[in-house]
Design a protein with these regions (language model features):
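Conserved P-loop NTPase motor cores
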Residues: 4, 67, 74-92, 96-104, ...
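Amphipathic alpha-helical segments of the small helical/lid subdomains adjacent to P-loop NTPase cores
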Residues: 198, 404-407
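Conserved ASCE P-loop ATPase motor domains encompassing nucleic-acid-directed helicases/translocases
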Residues: 1-13, 17
Length: 408
């Protein structure tokens, strides 16, 4: 830029600088020049960053400009993945934020699943308002999900995309493989020999109901278009008893889920698992039983996630710190990591929320906690205490200004 003094025209130049819309023709001719808008923006003194994605959901307001913040975390041109992590201390508003996000996703027609280990009843009114399905998983609950269910899947889209080249796998064998995880949860020190015995008992149980490794055997000849009736844990228990001493330990532990305090898990499924909004409430489960509830919920959700890659879906997990402790922390953590890393390939987003960051990062020196944060492109950081704020600021490389805002 070449500066030219306004000799004998100082008054006119001063008036031009004021917001009076008074332009002096002579000075204007001397000063005008062509400029790119990017260059022009650099001399504009009022600058603020805005986040307004097309087809996004409302997240809040920009504190600096009061403009609305809308984010479309499914926009692959802007975000590497659609995952979201919400961190904050007790009372910072994590659950409220998560609930609002889920309701707005549901309003846009996106499939919503949520696993709530604590205070699941806070979601009940929102679920009922949206016509969703609220499922309380606990001993004595009126809501039942059969662990041995082999559910019908809608493979229409997969057939259209992949045709006959789609990999076909025995549904029975896949379910047996999943139920092996259930046995590892109820019997932490189960041996490989006992797992093989349980595998044999499962095959015999399904065979009693006419179900073999052939997927066509799932269809009920007496009820066209429907699957055969599915066995229950009680039927599996009978097969374990028949096997004898080799299955004694497994049968003894399973008996609690057949006619003991947890016998509600030995009932046919009686909830609508095809709803567009499904909330699993695990609040009434003890620390010992919570891994079983997580297994039941994730077993169903993971099947539905992989059903259709073209359909957007959201899987939310509140109070993740409660999932990463106890005897099943390793199994739960690995399942969480599988969802975080692979859900993008199935058109989905994983939303995780947690307080008590010491517990969140405690297991295996924070391996799972750090991986969950790094695997989420969008992060909500709410009020934290000093120590937690320092840790998060260091982990996420926050500026001092950002770090100051998250301190309570």
């Amino acid at each position: 830029l070449n500066l030219r003094p306004c000799w004998f025209q100082m008054s006119e130049a001063f008036k031009m600088a004021l917001p009076l819309c008074q332009q002096h023709a002579g000075i204007f001719r001397k000063a005008r020049r062509n400029a790119l808008t990017s260059s022009l923006a650099s001399v504009y003194p009022y600058i603020t960053s805005e986040l307004t994605d097309d087809d996004g959901i409302l997240f809040g307001q920009n504190k600096q400009s009061d403009s609305f913040v809308t984010v479309n975390n499914f926009d692959t041109s802007k975000y590497e993945n659609a995952n979201v992590t919400i961190l904050g201390m007790t009372g910072a508003g994590k659950t409220f934020t998560l609930l609002n996000m889920l309701m707005r996703y549901r309003a846009k027609g996106i499939q919503v699943y949520a696993i709530i280990p604590k205070k699941g009843d806070e979601f009940l009114r929102a679920v009922e308002y949206n016509g969703g399905q609220y499922i309380n998983l606990s001993p004595g609950s009126i809501h039942n999900i059969n662990i041995l269910d082999i559910r019908k899947l809608d493979n229409t889209t997969r057939q259209l995309l992949d045709g006959d080249t789609a990999i076909k796998r025995s549904r029975r064998e896949a379910k047996i493989d999943q139920v092996r995880t259930f046995f590892q949860l109820i019997l932490n020190d189960i041996t490989q020999e006992e797992l093989e015995t349980a595998d044999e008992a499962l095959k015999n149980t399904y065979a009693r109901f006419g179900i073999t490794e052939d997927n066509d055997s799932l269809w009920d000849p007496d009820n066209p278009g429907e699957y055969r009736p599915m066995p229950l844990l009680g039927d599996l228990y009978e097969e374990l008893v028949k096997i004898g001493p080799d299955a004694r330990r497994v049968a003894k532990v399973l008996k609690r889920y057949v006619d003991g305090s947890a016998k509600s898990f030995n009932r046919p499924t009686n909830v609508n698992l095809d709803n567009k909004m499904i909330i699993f409430d695990l609040n009434d489960l003890t620390d010992e039983m919570r891994p079983i509830g997580i297994f039941i919920a994730l077993d169903y959700i993971w099947d539905k996630i992989r059903e259709d890659k073209t359909v957007r879906k959201v899987v939310a997990l509140d109070e993740v710190w409660a999932l990463l402790r106890g005897g099943a922390a390793k199994s739960t953590g690995e399942f969480l990591m599988e969802i975080i890393k692979t859900i993008r390939a199935f058109g989905g987003a994983a939303i995780t929320a947690s307080q008590d960051l010491r517990d969140f990062f405690a297991y295996k020196d924070g391996e799972y906690g750090k991986a969950i944060i790094s695997g989420s492109r969008t992060k909500f950081i709410m009020k934290l205490d000093e120590n937690e704020a320092d840790f998060v600021a260091e982990t996420l490389h926050l500026t001092k200004s950002d770090s100051d805002q998250i301190r309570r």
